Amino acid sequence: PALRIIPLAHSRATGMMDLADLKRKLSAETAAVYFENPSYLGSIETEGDTIAELAHQCGALLVVGADPSSCGVMAPPSRYGCDLVCGDIQALGMHMHYGGGLGGFIGCRDEERFVMEYPFRLFGIAETSVPGEWGFGDVAYSRTSFAQREQGKEFVGTAAALWGITAGVYLSLMGPKGMRELGATIMQKSQYAAARLSEIPGV
């Protein structure tokens, strides 16, 4: 197969990655190490910098799946050495309904080896001839399906682009302060729910 996924052990008590198991399974053939922070079970990985160091030592990338709702209160993946970050933007103002309201995001360092592989169109910002004015436009157009048809790296549909606008409006309305408040509220409610559930025998 072109790709082989090797699961890693984790602590049942904390949900954190078993670093000893990671060390055993890393090799020169490892392309990337991936983990979610927070995970789908709600655990928070606190050893991100160590995981990044171990991955980079064998030439692998560190890829982190992040919930944007958590980014207002948690350290961003870039802080602990992440090469690529990805996630779902459904939580950014999109109503839940049958089979819709979906979109994702990818982030990376400003390096050509990453950016040129993005599976969608790229837009850049530059100064115009009018002082203080900025313009936006397609970047690296030659890599798109418009230029190369089926050979292009980019593939994006109208629906995904529209949900991207929804997420952008949501973020602009929330602002940094609103995103911090959102993250703090989610953490507080989660801890409250866990405390109440733990009062039930057998839970």
Predicted regions and their residues:
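Active-site C-terminal subdomain of aminotransferase-like
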Residues: 89-203
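Active-site core of PLP-dependent enzymes with the aminotransferase class I/II
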Residues: 17-18, 38-58, 69-76
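General beta-strand structural signal in soluble alpha/beta enzymes
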Residues: 6-8, 35, 55, 62-66, ...
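PLP-dependent aminotransferase-class I/II
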Residues: 1-38, 42-43, 50
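Conserved active-site segment immediately N-terminal to the catalytic lysine
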Residues: 78-93
